[in-house]
Curated annotation (Swiss-Prot):
Keywords: Cobalamin biosynthesis, Glycosyltransferase, Transferase
GO MF term set: nicotinate-nucleotide-dimethylbenzimidazole phosphoribosyltransferase activity
Gene name tied to this protein: cobT
Catalytic activity: 5,6-dimethylbenzimidazole + nicotinate beta-D-ribonucleotide = alpha-ribazole 5'-phosphate + nicotinate + H(+)
InterPro entries with a match to the protein in the record: Nict_dMeBzImd_PRibTrfase (IPR003200), Nict_dMeBzImd_PRibTrfase_bact (IPR017846), Nict_dMeBzImd_PRibTrfase_N (IPR023195), Nict_dMeBzImd_PRibTrfase_sf (IPR036087)
Function: Catalyzes the synthesis of alpha-ribazole-5'-phosphate from nicotinate mononucleotide (NAMN) and 5,6-dimethylbenzimidazole (DMB).
Name this polypeptide is given: Nicotinate-nucleotide--dimethylbenzimidazole phosphoribosyltransferase
Amino acid sequence: MIGFAPISAPDALAEAAARARQDALTKPRGALGRLEDLSAWVASCQGQCPPRQFQRARVVVFAGDHGITRSGVSAYPPDATAQMVANIDGGGAAINALADVAGATVRVVDLAVDAEALSEQIGAHKVRRGSGDIATEDALTDDQTAAAIAAGQQIADAEVDAGADLLIAGDMGIGNTTPAAVLVAALTNTEPVAVVGFGTGVDDATWSRKTAAVRDALFRSARVLPDPVALLRCCGGADLAAMAGFCAQAAVRRTPLLLDGMAVTAAALVAERLAPGARQWWQAGHRSTEPGHQLALTALALDPVVDLRMRLGEGTGATVALPVLRAAVAALSSMATFAEAGVSTACDDAGATEPPES
């Protein structure tokens, strides 16, 4: 039985206290822009003002292969997934480099890589070798779908129990933006041509094949659209199902989470249907160049923290946003108030001006 505990909202009193404190800090009101909103969100998630700086930010990269790659939808061969899992585990991937400077640690998990698991730990939640070709068959069986969602729940629980105070979901899987595009198209009622991007840098012919594959899978998805679990079974994959479980369970555990790009946010769209209200505990780390990513963000009513034209995945865009989130927390928790610093506030009369920009 697949289920999630009811999602409770972040602490509104802590958020209000954070916004009041922002107005009392030695700066004009609103001068820190989006940082003020982010700091209030962190305070609400932590239930305290000022918020604590993140001590154990954790990136979890969900890996899996997809049968749809046999249709030629990616610029890379399927065996690159297993090779990149080894690269991430060895510390040589982009996510490792970016996490190091952002103050986060990285874990990679194999849900459906089409190879033997690299290690017992990495493969502890492996559901199968490769997901089905969603253009012609279901990605998973019912039991595999349930197992993958449960794996995501268990991984989130394990990370929070180990002390993680911020989670980042990342992905690794050749061709995974194809099932992600199907999920986004299905859940936003969008035509394939408006959702499909160029992924890892495909040419026009590959884009056409990818769009056709999404069209065929989207046709198959119509019969299961009202059921998020059935949608993952039909047109998702073990990695996407696990990411959905992970994102939803982070909210159950009242732990803030940064979403990454197309694959993660597509899974999050499903997660919001599995556990309504979960999106209150998420921020969009970045906006990918994939057109479907913005559609998914709009559906979730999330604004990206950064927009650097990234399209890599792995959790890289969200990890680049982490220092911005840290800066937001630092400003709210470490700045002095006008009263503490003995600085004059803006005058109340009509001709008054606020302190100038420095």
